[in-house]
């Protein structure tokens, strides 16, 4: 039985004071959660948030990282830096990174491997555009993304990975894939993993849905057999809303 995981991606929101205020309000609201709870604040808030949630059931993730340990990469953060802050997770390959920063599947693969070297769990994102869905190539696009992202990993690494299916057309638009669309697409992703690393790995890997997730939609989504959680954007910035999603 796969344990659900709900992660909040704050994106480029919240200064340090606002971040700590949000966390303090959230902590008692999710104390009894049956799922894994992860917060992914901006880099500048990571250290303070890690310290604030110490001793609670909340884990902390970063929103991105570089695949090199150090060097002349102005503005970048290394996996070793994240590990020194006691970060447990890192989002890799978010659609906004692909769109605005031209991040490629091969780069994502390098980041995944480097995250594992530092015992950081990758939340690996994949998803299709509206045009790709309308053209009927969703499965082809996702298959390519997953095959390249998970290339040359060990089976035990794949079993630890969290995959987030985020239809690009549903991010920040208010549009949401139907529960059946989301479940069927995630089932396809699981099938790709099965062909690469075997049925056991595919059954163990946790796959989230991420696309305008709200308190009103989460319960039905979590009733789908292949959906193991959510990567939450805007709703994670509101403690009451995020808690309602966590406590679905």
Swiss-Prot record:
Keywords: Cytoplasm, Gluconeogenesis, Glycolysis, Isomerase
Domain of life: Bacteria
Organism: Clostridium kluyveri (strain ATCC 8527 / DSM 555 / NBRC 12016 / NCIMB 10680 / K1)
Main location: cytoplasm
Catalytic activity reported: D-glyceraldehyde 3-phosphate = dihydroxyacetone phosphate
Name this protein carries in UniProt: Triosephosphate isomerase
Enzyme Commission (EC) number: 5.3.1.1
GO CC term (a single one): cytosol
InterPro entries in the cross-refs: Aldolase_TIM, TIM_sf, TrioseP_Isoase_bac/euk, Triosephosphate_isomerase, Triosephosphate_isomerase_AS
GO term, biological process aspect, one: glyceraldehyde-3-phosphate biosynthetic process
